[in-house]
Amino acid sequence: MSNVPAELKYSKEHEWLRKEADGTYTVGITEHAQELLGDMVFVDLPDVGTTVSAGDDCAVAESVKAASDIYAPVSGEIVAVNDALSDSPELVNSDPYTDGWIFKIRAADEAEVEALLDATAYAALLENE
């Protein structure tokens, strides 16, 4: 079974969300998602300053197997992207929950964050896939 850190929130599309000290949220794809995709070769990052709605495709992860959209788990403004992925997309594979993060977002509505899955619910989702 994939690693599902307890402190994160999760989307049904296999993105994770972590609240930062400055009130923003860091977003990436889960260990389960990167395992399905395989070795990353490119990550198309969103533009900083872009406003997105929950469920919008805002980035693309390209692997040796497929290209997969990455969706905004909550509505808000993209405030940072992980530029290290331009040269090292494999960070998404080796460290999906830390160095392999994809973007940071300032959430427009905290209720959307609360509506995401907790680790227990996400683990249950994985068991049913």
Curated annotation (Swiss-Prot):
What's a single GO CC term here? Answer: glycine cleavage complex
Name a biological process GO annotation.
glycine decarboxylation via glycine cleavage system
Would you indicate the residue range of the signal peptide? Answer: none
Q: How is the cofactor bound?
A: Binds 1 lipoyl cofactor covalently.
Q: SUPFAM superfamilies, alphabetically?
A: Single hybrid motif (SSF51230)
Names of the cofactor(s):
(R)-lipoate
Q: Does the keyword tRNA-binding apply?
A: no
* Lineage: superkingdom: Bacteria
Where do the Lipoyl-binding domain residues begin and end? 24-106
- Indicate where the modification N6-lipoyllysine is found in the sequence: K65
Keywords, comma-separated and alphabetical? Lipoyl
Task: Name the family.
Answer: Belongs to the GcvH family.
Q: How does this polypeptide assemble, per the annotation?
A: The glycine cleavage system is composed of four proteins: P, T, L and H.
Q: What does this protein do?
A: The glycine cleavage system catalyzes the degradation of glycine. The H protein shuttles the methylamine group of glycine from the P protein to the T protein.
Q: What is this protein called?
A: Glycine cleavage system H protein
Tell me what organism the protein belongs to. Enterobacter sp. (strain 638)
Q: Which gene encodes it?
A: gcvH
